[in-house]
């Protein structure tokens, strides 16, 4: 009996204890189990802005409770709570914290967390002066706050981590930050290139400031390049972020002087003269202006160095801009002579020289009386000259007429083809005659008229071409559209072709159609046929304009090729220039899209692949330029007009024999001066095309007249590095512009190098939009009077040439140097 009562007593006691220990279901602390990780939504708000937080609700919600840092959130004159939404007017840094929305419903409770940071802090790369003490206090405060919910790590200042790529010069201090939080406080560790990063892995070590979640590396060197990853973790989760560091070595190079400056001057006696010298140097340069003088009747001293007089040298308070200009006032005849701009740094010396010529002021002189005999001689000479010109004109006209006739009647086969097209021309004797006689060369029959009822060519009968079943497309399957462009005798129109794909006979394809204009000649017809046959022989490749078909029967000749909707590469690049960097500023200009460095390298890579394929087919382009590269809707580069190139089977060069108009600014020296064309002359043109790409459609040699280009190229001048171009790509251009053709790279080598560069180039490397306007070359015609480009600017650098005698150095710091011709 007693034992039964004892058992009953203990049962009642245990039941009461369990009921007392059961927590209240309304406590907000139990809204989320302590063992579960929590998702946190981050908000960055600038001081003074409106903060709005909205809670996600279920349909059966019964109550909503808002907390901040675990404390009940109360309404105030700035804080308004309306059920599932909280609004804070004119937010201040004190409003920062972890907000929680706790909802209760019959199905259970749910909590949504918001991390709010009210700050106007700068991004990580610019925020280097943090108050570590305040951060430490904040961290300690976080640790000591009671009743904190378990929270997986989260970023507290993601805006400071937006810049992922950091390119810094050598010897600079680098600081990467990963500001974060969580409950319990997370730990921080760093990886380099995916491996654990310890202080002894780096010369000089590094510092980690856990209070500010940052790593600091002093005096970085090229070996510090790599990917640095911060890992923040606690028992409820882990997050990471990667920074990329690129350390740029300072360029050890002597000063670079802009080509063409100072320039020669010819002035009148008593005038004022200004010489200018542009100097580019990474180490601080020392600039002097010198005048060459004579000593005892000699300009050269016993040491074989010229005698010079120092006219201007840098002082303590003199700026480089002041030193780049030399002013001479009220010049006399004694001021005439040679002047030199000498610039030196710790690496070496550079100099450019110019001549000053002083003339007497022009005076009006009385007209010289001419004798009757002198006048008679002038009249006879003028008459003889005019008669000679008339006779010469008649002879030239006769020769041209004879050439045109023999061109067609005796040599009508198309010279541009490796295999000539069989064309036969019928000459009708009379309208009544049923007989006709054929010309001696096998060509095509004429006599058909175009659909308009008029001859296709003025003065040329329409020719019937042999049908090629592989390429022939019925005319009723081709619908012509708007014109795309035209030349002197040909035009290109947009069209829709039905059934180009034999497997899909009803598919409609947008195409471009080449055709002749009404005033074209027999030569133009043969050229178009030649281009068509050349495209058949070349075959298909992704990076060339491919032949799709032709209409050769029952009407004019239509050559059907691929359509590139975005126009040529030059226009494509110019349309995507950043706003404000056009040469004639247009405030309404909106670029199509922003191009990254990888986009530009990809353009060059695709063109190189197309040229590699043409070279493998023994095809020399002769006119490779951005204007002859077309861009499709999918941004695929396609080389055009290669059908006009020459097919070579037995020799690997082509020597031009006619005097057609040539694009001289893209031509290699051997093509320009000796009229020799090879694959290596195409490589030179590819180097100019590279320069066009990285100047976003700039015009080569801006401000340089064509007549001066020959002299400049012979002297070894080359265009300078574009602003948006790496040193590696510029060296590729310079290799393409090597004076010796055999020393230039092949297209196969260019494809391999560009393929490697594309793989290493980041998609996030956008062009430098802060570059000054004059770093780009103008896209307008090269005239010195252009309002959009400066004729005084030069973009040339100079290849090293044999040394000239050196100047003695007259300040002590230049005592052992000399002048060398660049």
Curated annotation (Swiss-Prot):
Changing residue 4 to C: In HH2; uncertain significance. It catalyses: L-tyrosyl-[protein] + ATP = O-phospho-L-tyrosyl-[protein] + ADP + H(+). Disulfide bonds join 55-101, 178-230, 277-341. The keyword Cell membrane applies. Residues 778-792 have a biased composition (Polar residues). The record marks 428-429 as: Breakpoint for translocation to form CEP43-FGFR1 or FGFR1-CEP43 fusion proteins. Its main location: membrane. Present in an inactive conformation in the absence of bound ligand. Ligand binding leads to dimerization and activation by sequential autophosphorylation on tyrosine residues. Inhibited by ARQ 069; this compound maintains the kinase in an inactive conformation and inhibits autophosphorylation. Inhibited by PD173074. Changing residue 374 to C: In OGD; elevated basal activity and increased FGF2-mediated activity. Residues 136-145 have a biased composition (Basic and acidic residues). It is found in: Cell membrane; Nucleus; Cytoplasm, Cytosol; Cytoplasmic vesicle. The record marks 766 as: Mediates interaction with PLCG1 and SHB. It is a single-pass type I membrane protein. Autophosphorylated. Binding of FGF family members together with heparan sulfate proteoglycan or heparin promotes receptor dimerization and autophosphorylation on tyrosine residues. Autophosphorylation occurs in trans between the two FGFR molecules present in the dimer and proceeds in a highly ordered manner. Initial autophosphorylation at Tyr-653 increases the kinase activity by a factor of 50 to 100. After this, Tyr-583 becomes phosphorylated, followed by phosphorylation of Tyr-463, Tyr-766, Tyr-583 and Tyr-585. Residues 160-177 are annotated as: Heparin-binding. Residues 125-135 have a biased composition (Acidic residues). Residues 120-154, 778-822 are annotated as: Disordered. GO terms for biological process: angiogenesis; auditory receptor cell development; branching involved in salivary gland morphogenesis; calcium ion homeostasis; cardiac muscle cell proliferation; cell maturation; cell migration; cell projection assembly. Glycans are attached at residues 77, 117, 227, 240, 264, 296, 317, 330. GO terms for molecular function: ATP binding; fibroblast growth factor binding; fibroblast growth factor receptor activity; heparin binding; identical protein binding; protein homodimerization activity; protein tyrosine kinase activity; receptor-receptor interaction. It is an enzyme of class 2 (transferase). Residues 25-119, 158-246, 255-357 form the Ig-like C2-type domain. ATP binds at residues 484-490, 514, 562-564, 568, 627, 641. It is linked to Pfeiffer syndrome: A syndrome characterized by the association of craniosynostosis, broad and deviated thumbs and big toes, and partial syndactyly of the fingers and toes. Three subtypes are known: mild autosomal dominant form (type 1); cloverleaf skull, elbow ankylosis, early death, sporadic (type 2); craniosynostosis, early demise, sporadic (type 3). The second and third Ig-like domains directly interact with fibroblast growth factors (FGF) and heparan sulfate proteoglycans. Isoforms lacking the first Ig-like domain have higher affinity for fibroblast growth factors (FGF) and heparan sulfate proteoglycans than isoforms with all three Ig-like domains. This is Fibroblast growth factor receptor 1.
């Amino acid at each position: 009996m007693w034992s039964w009562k004892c058992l009953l007593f203990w049962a009642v006691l245990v039941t009461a204890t369990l009921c007392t220990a059961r927590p209240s279901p309304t406590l907000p602390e139990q809204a989320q189990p302590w063992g579960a990780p929590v998702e946190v939504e981050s908000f960055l708000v600038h001081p003074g802005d409106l903060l709005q937080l909205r809670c996600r609700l279920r349909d059966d919600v019964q109550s909503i409770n808002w907390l901040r840092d675990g404390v009940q959130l109360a309404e105030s004159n700035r804080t308004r709570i309306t059920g599932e939404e909280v609004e804070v007017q004119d937010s201040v840094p004190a409003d920062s914290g972890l907000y929680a929305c706790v909802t209760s419903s019959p199905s259970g409770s749910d909590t949504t967390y918001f991390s709010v940071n009210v700050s106007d802090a700068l991004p990580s790369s610019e925020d280097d002066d943090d108050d570590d003490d305040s951060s430490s206090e904040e961290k300690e405060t976080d640790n000591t706050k009671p009743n904190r919910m378990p929270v997986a790590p989260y970023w507290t200042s993601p805006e400071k981590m937006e810049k992922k790529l950091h390119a810094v010069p050598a010897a600079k201090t680098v600081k990467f930050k990963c500001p974060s939080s969580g409950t319990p406080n997370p730990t921080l560790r760093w990886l380099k290139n995916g491996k654990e990063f310890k202080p002894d892995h780096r010369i000089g070590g590094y510092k980690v400031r856990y209070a500010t979640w940052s790593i600091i590396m002093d005096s970085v060197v090229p070996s510090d390049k790599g990917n640095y990853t911060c890992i923040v973790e606690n028992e409820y989760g882990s997050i990471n972020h990667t920074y990329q560091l690129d350390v740029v070595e300072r360029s050890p190079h002597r000063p670079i002087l802009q080509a063409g400056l100072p320039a020669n001057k010819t002035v009148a006696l008593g005038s004022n003269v200004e010489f200018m010298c542009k100097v580019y140097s990474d180490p601080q340069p020392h600039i002097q202006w010198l005048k060459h003088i004579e000593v005892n009747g000699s300009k050269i001293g016993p040491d074989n160095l010229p005698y010079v007089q120092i006219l201007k040298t840098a002082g303590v308070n003199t700026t480089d801009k002041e030193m780049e200009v030399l002013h001479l006032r009220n010049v006399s005849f004694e001021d005439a002579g040679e002047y030199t701009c000498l610039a030196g740094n710790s690496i070496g010396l550079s100099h450019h020289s110019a001549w000053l010529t002083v003339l007497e002021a022009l005076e009006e002189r009385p007209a010289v009386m001419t004798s009757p005999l002198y006048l008679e001689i002038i009249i006879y000479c003028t008459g003889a000259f005019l008669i000679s010109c008339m006779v010469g004109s008649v002879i030239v006209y006769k020769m041209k007429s004879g050439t045109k006739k023999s061109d067609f009647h005796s040599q009508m086969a198309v010279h541009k083809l490796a295999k000539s097209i069989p064309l036969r021309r019928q000459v009708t004797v009379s309208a009544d005659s049923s007989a006709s006689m054929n010309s001696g060369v096998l060509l095509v029959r004429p006599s058909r008229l175009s659909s308009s009822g008029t001859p296709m060519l003025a003065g040329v009968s329409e020719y019937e071409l042999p049908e090629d079943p592989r390429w022939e497309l019925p005319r009723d399957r081709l619908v012509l559209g708007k014109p795309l462009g035209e030349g002197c005798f040909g035009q290109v129109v947009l069209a829709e072709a039905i059934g180009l794909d034999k497997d899909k006979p009803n598919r409609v394809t947008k195409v471009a159609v080449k055709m002749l204009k009404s005033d074209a000649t027999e030569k133009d017809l043969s050229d178009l046929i030649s281009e068509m046959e050349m495209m058949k022989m070349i075959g298909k490749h992704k990076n060339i304009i491919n032949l799709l078909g032709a209409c050769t029967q029952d009407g004019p000749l239509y050559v059907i090729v691929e359509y590139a909707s975005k126009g040529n590469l030059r226009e494509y690049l110019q349309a995507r220039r950043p706003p404000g960097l056009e040469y004639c500023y247009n405030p309404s200009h909106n670029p199509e899209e922003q191009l990254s460095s990888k986009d530009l390298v990809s353009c060059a890579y695709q063109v190189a692949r197309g040229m590699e394929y043409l070279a493998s087919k023994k095809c020399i382009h002769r006119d490779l330029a951005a204007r002859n590269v077309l861009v499709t809707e999918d941004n695929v580069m396609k080389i055009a007009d290669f059908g006009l190139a020459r097919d070579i089977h037995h020799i690997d060069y082509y020597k031009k024999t006619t005097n057609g108009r040539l694009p001289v600014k893209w031509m290699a020296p051997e093509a320009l001066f000796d009229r020799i064309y090879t694959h290596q002359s195409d490589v030179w043109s590819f180097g100019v095309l590279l320069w066009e790409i990285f100047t976003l459609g700039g015009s080569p040699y801006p401000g340089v007249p064509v007549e001066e280009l020959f002299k400049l190229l012979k002297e070894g001048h080359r265009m300078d590095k574009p602003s948006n171009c790496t040193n590696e790509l510029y060296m590729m251009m310079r290799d393409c512009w090597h004076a010796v053709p055999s020393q230039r790279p092949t297209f196969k080598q260019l494809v391999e190098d560009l393929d490697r560069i594309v793989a290493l180039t980041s998609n996030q490397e956008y062009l430098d939009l802060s570059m000054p306007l004059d770093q780009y070359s103008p896209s307008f015609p090269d005239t010195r009077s252009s309002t959009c480009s400066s004729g005084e600017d030069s973009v040339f650098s100079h290849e090293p040439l044999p040394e000239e005698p050196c100047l003695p150095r007259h300040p002590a710091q230049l005592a052992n140097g000399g002048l060398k011709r660049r």
